[in-house]
Protein backbone atom coordinates (compact mmCIF):
# COMPACT_ATOMS: atom_id res chain seq x y z
CA UNK A 1 0.00 0.00 0.00
CA UNK A 2 1.29 3.51 -0.72
CA UNK A 3 2.49 5.86 1.98
CA UNK A 4 3.22 9.59 1.93
CA UNK A 5 6.41 10.90 3.45
CA UNK A 6 6.24 14.49 4.60
CA UNK A 7 9.24 16.82 4.21
CA UNK A 8 8.53 18.38 7.61
CA UNK A 9 9.47 15.08 9.28
CA UNK A 10 12.77 14.49 11.11
CA UNK A 11 16.04 13.63 9.35
CA UNK A 12 16.20 10.08 8.01
CA UNK A 13 12.40 9.73 8.15
CA UNK A 14 11.40 6.91 5.86
CA UNK A 15 14.90 6.12 4.67
CA UNK A 16 18.28 4.79 5.75
CA UNK A 17 19.08 2.33 8.48
CA UNK A 18 17.69 4.55 11.22
CA UNK A 19 18.67 4.69 14.87
CA UNK A 20 17.54 2.48 17.72
CA UNK A 21 13.77 2.05 18.04
CA UNK A 22 13.42 2.59 21.79
CA UNK A 23 9.66 2.26 22.01
CA UNK A 24 6.30 2.84 20.37
CA UNK A 25 3.46 4.86 21.91
CA UNK A 26 -0.01 4.39 20.49
CA UNK A 27 -2.87 6.84 20.62
CA UNK A 28 -6.09 4.97 21.37
CA UNK A 29 -9.21 6.33 19.66
CA UNK A 30 -8.85 5.92 15.92
CA UNK A 31 -5.51 4.12 16.15
CA UNK A 32 -5.98 0.89 18.08
CA UNK A 33 -9.78 0.98 18.08
CA UNK A 34 -12.25 2.75 15.81
CA UNK A 35 -14.13 4.43 18.64
CA UNK A 36 -14.29 8.04 17.48
CA UNK A 37 -17.48 7.66 15.37
CA UNK A 38 -19.19 6.01 18.35
CA UNK A 39 -18.10 8.79 20.70
CA UNK A 40 -19.22 11.56 18.35
CA UNK A 41 -22.53 9.75 17.72
CA UNK A 42 -23.14 9.55 21.47
CA UNK A 43 -22.40 13.25 21.93
CA UNK A 44 -24.64 14.23 19.01
CA UNK A 45 -27.41 12.01 20.39
CA UNK A 46 -27.21 13.66 23.81
CA UNK A 47 -27.32 17.15 22.31
CA UNK A 48 -30.26 16.27 20.04
CA UNK A 49 -32.27 15.00 23.00
CA UNK A 50 -31.70 18.42 24.58
CA UNK A 51 -32.89 20.24 21.48
CA UNK A 52 -29.54 21.10 19.87
CA UNK A 53 -28.22 19.76 16.57
CA UNK A 54 -24.41 19.68 16.47
CA UNK A 55 -22.95 20.35 13.05
CA UNK A 56 -20.73 17.65 11.48
CA UNK A 57 -17.96 20.27 11.19
CA UNK A 58 -18.01 20.83 14.95
CA UNK A 59 -17.93 17.10 15.68
CA UNK A 60 -15.00 16.82 13.28
CA UNK A 61 -13.13 19.56 15.17
CA UNK A 62 -13.72 17.76 18.47
CA UNK A 63 -12.01 14.58 17.25
CA UNK A 64 -8.85 13.95 19.26
CA UNK A 65 -9.76 16.56 21.87
CA UNK A 66 -9.99 15.67 25.56
CA UNK A 67 -13.41 14.66 26.85
CA UNK A 68 -13.27 17.51 29.36
CA UNK A 69 -12.92 20.01 26.51
CA UNK A 70 -15.65 18.27 24.50
CA UNK A 71 -18.02 18.57 27.45
CA UNK A 72 -17.15 22.27 27.79
CA UNK A 73 -17.93 22.94 24.13
CA UNK A 74 -21.13 20.92 24.12
CA UNK A 75 -22.23 22.40 27.43
CA UNK A 76 -21.74 25.90 26.05
CA UNK A 77 -23.88 25.06 23.04
CA UNK A 78 -26.63 23.68 25.27
CA UNK A 79 -26.77 26.81 27.42
CA UNK A 80 -26.39 27.90 31.04
CA UNK A 81 -29.04 25.56 32.39
CA UNK A 82 -26.96 22.45 31.71
CA UNK A 83 -25.28 20.73 34.65
CA UNK A 84 -21.79 19.74 33.39
CA UNK A 85 -21.51 16.95 35.96
CA UNK A 86 -24.84 15.46 34.88
CA UNK A 87 -23.83 15.83 31.22
CA UNK A 88 -20.61 13.91 31.81
CA UNK A 89 -22.43 11.22 33.81
CA UNK A 90 -24.95 10.81 30.99
CA UNK A 91 -22.14 10.44 28.47
CA UNK A 92 -20.32 7.82 30.55
CA UNK A 93 -23.53 5.85 31.14
CA UNK A 94 -24.19 5.67 27.41
CA UNK A 95 -20.73 5.45 25.92
CA UNK A 96 -18.78 3.06 28.15
CA UNK A 97 -21.14 0.06 27.74
CA UNK A 98 -21.24 0.65 23.99
CA UNK A 99 -17.46 0.89 23.87
CA UNK A 100 -16.96 -2.36 25.79
CA UNK A 101 -19.46 -4.16 23.56
CA UNK A 102 -18.08 -2.92 20.25
CA UNK A 103 -14.32 -2.51 20.79
CA UNK A 104 -12.35 -4.40 18.15
CA UNK A 105 -8.72 -4.01 17.06
CA UNK A 106 -8.12 -1.88 14.00
CA UNK A 107 -6.77 -3.71 10.93
CA UNK A 108 -3.09 -4.48 11.34
CA UNK A 109 -2.93 -3.79 15.09
CA UNK A 110 -2.49 -7.37 16.25
CA UNK A 111 0.22 -8.10 13.69
CA UNK A 112 2.10 -4.88 14.52
CA UNK A 113 1.93 -5.49 18.27
CA UNK A 114 3.10 -9.08 17.83
CA UNK A 115 6.04 -7.89 15.75
CA UNK A 116 7.03 -5.23 18.26
CA UNK A 117 6.76 -7.67 21.15
CA UNK A 118 8.84 -10.24 19.28
CA UNK A 119 11.50 -7.60 18.64
CA UNK A 120 11.54 -6.59 22.30
CA UNK A 121 10.27 -3.08 21.61
CA UNK A 122 8.36 -1.69 24.62
CA UNK A 123 4.93 -0.21 23.99
CA UNK A 124 2.74 2.32 25.78
CA UNK A 125 -0.48 4.21 25.20
CA UNK A 126 -1.12 7.98 25.36
CA UNK A 127 -4.74 9.02 25.02
CA UNK A 128 -6.93 12.04 25.69
CA UNK A 129 -9.56 9.53 26.84
CA UNK A 130 -10.36 8.87 30.47
CA UNK A 131 -8.84 6.02 32.44
CA UNK A 132 -12.26 4.32 32.43
CA UNK A 133 -12.42 4.47 28.64
CA UNK A 134 -8.83 3.27 28.31
CA UNK A 135 -9.54 0.39 30.66
CA UNK A 136 -12.62 -0.58 28.67
CA UNK A 137 -10.62 -0.74 25.44
CA UNK A 138 -7.44 -2.38 26.72
CA UNK A 139 -9.55 -4.93 28.58
CA UNK A 140 -11.67 -5.74 25.53
CA UNK A 141 -8.58 -6.05 23.32
CA UNK A 142 -6.51 -7.99 25.85
CA UNK A 143 -3.70 -5.43 25.91
CA UNK A 144 -3.23 -5.25 29.66
CA UNK A 145 -0.13 -7.43 29.63
CA UNK A 146 1.31 -5.91 26.47
CA UNK A 147 1.55 -2.23 27.33
CA UNK A 148 4.33 -1.14 29.64
CA UNK A 149 2.51 2.06 30.50
CA UNK A 150 -0.71 3.96 29.96
CA UNK A 151 -1.19 7.73 30.17
CA UNK A 152 -4.60 9.40 30.20
CA UNK A 153 -5.53 12.98 29.44
CA UNK A 154 -7.26 13.19 32.81
CA UNK A 155 -3.88 12.65 34.52
CA UNK A 156 -2.27 15.79 33.10
CA UNK A 157 -2.99 19.50 33.34
CA UNK A 158 -2.84 20.29 29.64
CA UNK A 159 -4.45 18.13 26.98
CA UNK A 160 -3.29 17.55 23.42
CA UNK A 161 -1.87 19.41 21.47
CA UNK A 162 0.25 20.10 24.56
CA UNK A 163 2.89 17.36 25.00
CA UNK A 164 1.99 16.49 28.61
CA UNK A 165 0.26 13.14 28.05
CA UNK A 166 3.10 11.97 25.79
CA UNK A 167 5.74 13.07 28.27
CA UNK A 168 3.93 11.02 30.93
CA UNK A 169 3.72 8.03 28.58
CA UNK A 170 7.45 8.27 27.80
CA UNK A 171 8.20 8.33 31.52
CA UNK A 172 6.09 5.22 32.09
CA UNK A 173 7.65 3.57 29.06
CA UNK A 174 10.97 3.84 30.87
CA UNK A 175 12.78 5.59 28.03
CA UNK A 176 13.72 9.07 26.92
CA UNK A 177 11.98 10.56 23.89
CA UNK A 178 14.91 9.78 21.57
CA UNK A 179 14.09 6.74 19.47
CA UNK A 180 10.42 6.61 20.47
CA UNK A 181 7.80 6.62 17.71
CA UNK A 182 4.22 7.75 18.32
CA UNK A 183 1.28 6.61 16.21
CA UNK A 184 -1.57 9.13 15.99
CA UNK A 185 -4.65 9.85 13.92
CA UNK A 186 -5.41 13.50 14.66
CA UNK A 187 -3.64 16.80 14.07
CA UNK A 188 -3.78 17.63 17.77
CA UNK A 189 -2.24 14.27 18.61
CA UNK A 190 0.56 14.63 16.07
CA UNK A 191 1.33 18.11 17.42
CA UNK A 192 1.45 16.74 20.98
CA UNK A 193 3.79 13.89 20.06
CA UNK A 194 6.16 16.14 18.11
CA UNK A 195 6.16 18.70 20.93
CA UNK A 196 7.23 15.88 23.27
CA UNK A 197 10.23 15.19 21.03
CA UNK A 198 8.88 12.04 19.37
CA UNK A 199 8.85 10.95 15.76
CA UNK A 200 5.19 10.60 14.77
CA UNK A 201 3.30 8.47 12.26
CA UNK A 202 -0.14 9.75 11.29
CA UNK A 203 -2.93 7.34 10.39
CA UNK A 204 -5.36 9.13 8.10
CA UNK A 205 -8.83 7.78 8.94
CA UNK A 206 -12.28 8.51 7.58
CA UNK A 207 -12.83 10.78 10.58
CA UNK A 208 -9.52 12.68 10.35
CA UNK A 209 -8.93 12.71 6.60
CA UNK A 210 -9.09 16.51 6.55
CA UNK A 211 -6.58 17.06 9.37
CA UNK A 212 -3.25 18.77 8.71
CA UNK A 213 -0.54 16.14 9.24
CA UNK A 214 2.34 18.34 8.12
CA UNK A 215 4.35 17.57 11.27
CA UNK A 216 4.18 13.80 10.80
CA UNK A 217 7.22 11.87 9.60
CA UNK A 218 4.97 9.45 7.73
CA UNK A 219 1.30 9.31 6.78
CA UNK A 220 -0.46 5.97 6.28
CA UNK A 221 -4.06 4.93 5.82
CA UNK A 222 -3.91 1.88 8.09
CA UNK A 223 -1.70 0.11 10.63
CA UNK A 224 -1.47 -2.63 8.00
CA UNK A 225 1.11 -0.45 6.27
CA UNK A 226 3.44 -0.47 9.29
CA UNK A 227 5.96 -3.00 10.58
CA UNK A 228 8.94 -2.99 12.93
CA UNK A 229 11.47 -2.41 10.17
CA UNK A 230 9.53 0.54 8.81
CA UNK A 231 9.24 2.16 12.24
CA UNK A 232 12.94 1.55 12.81
CA UNK A 233 13.77 3.49 9.66
CA UNK A 234 11.87 6.52 10.95
CA UNK A 235 14.18 6.92 13.93
CA UNK A 236 16.93 9.47 13.21
CA UNK A 237 20.31 7.73 12.89
CA UNK A 238 22.99 8.27 15.45
CA UNK A 239 25.39 11.05 14.55
Give short role names for the model-derived ranges.
Residues 2-60:
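Active-site neighborhood of HAD-like aspartate-dependent phosphohydrolases
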Residues 39, 63-67, 87-95, 130, ...:
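Hydrophobic/aromatic residues within well-ordered alpha-helical segments
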Residues 38, 62-66, 104-108, 129, ...:
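Short beta->alpha linker loops
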Residues 53, 74-111, 119:
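Metal-dependent phosphoesterase signature
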Residues 41-84, 107:
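Alpha-helical substrate-recognition element adjacent to the catalytic core
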Residues 1-22, 114-117, 130-239:
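Asp-based, Mg2+/Mn2+-dependent phosphohydrolase catalytic module
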Amino acid sequence: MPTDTVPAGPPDAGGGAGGQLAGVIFDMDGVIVDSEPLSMKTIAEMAAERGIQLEPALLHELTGVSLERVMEVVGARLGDGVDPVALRSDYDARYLPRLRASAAPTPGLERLIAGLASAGVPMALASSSTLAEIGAVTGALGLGGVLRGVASGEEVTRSKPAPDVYLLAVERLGAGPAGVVAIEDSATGVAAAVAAGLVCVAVRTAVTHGHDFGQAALIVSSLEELDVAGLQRLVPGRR
